[in-house]
């Protein structure tokens, strides 16, 4: 049961990590875009 629980945690963390990276890259892109203006 512990292995299934850990597997569920990993499956839950992967999308959150990808979303965090995407948001960070998007904010940096907008920040650079504002600096161009």
From Swiss-Prot:
Keyword Repressor among UniProt keywords: no
GO biological process: cytochrome complex assembly; photosynthesis
Sequence intervals crossing the membrane: 5-25
Domain of life of the organism encoding this protein: Eukaryota
Any one Gene Ontology cellular component term annotated for this protein: cytochrome b6f complex
Molecular function GO terms recorded: electron transporter, transferring electrons within cytochrome b6/f complex of photosystem II activity
Keywords: Chloroplast, Electron transport, Membrane, Photosynthesis, Plastid, Thylakoid, Transmembrane, Transmembrane helix, Transport
InterPro entries, alphabetized: Cyt_6/f_cplx_su5, Cyt_6/f_cplx_su5_sf
Pfam families hit by this protein: PetG (PF02529)
UniProt-annotated location(s): Plastid, Chloroplast thylakoid membrane
SS bond list: none
Lipid bilayer topology: Single-pass membrane protein
Oligomeric and partner information: The 4 large subunits of the cytochrome b6-f complex are cytochrome b6, subunit IV (17 kDa polypeptide, PetD), cytochrome f and the Rieske protein, while the 4 small subunits are PetG, PetL, PetM and PetN. The complex functions as a dimer.
The protein's role, per its UniProt record: Component of the cytochrome b6-f complex, which mediates electron transfer between photosystem II (PSII) and photosystem I (PSI), cyclic electron flow around PSI, and state transitions. PetG is required for either the stability or assembly of the cytochrome b6-f complex.
Entry's family note: Belongs to the PetG family.
Alphabetical list of NCBIfam families matching this protein: PRK00665.1
Protein name: Cytochrome b6-f complex subunit 5
Source organism: Arabidopsis thaliana (Mouse-ear cress)
Lineage: Eukaryota, Viridiplantae, Streptophyta, Embryophyta, Tracheophyta
Gene this chain is encoded by: petG
């Amino acid at each position: 049961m512990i292995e299934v629980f850990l597997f569920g945690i990993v499956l839950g963390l992967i999308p959150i990590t990808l979303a965090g990276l995407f948001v960070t890259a998007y904010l940096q892109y907008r920040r650079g875009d504002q600096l161009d203006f």
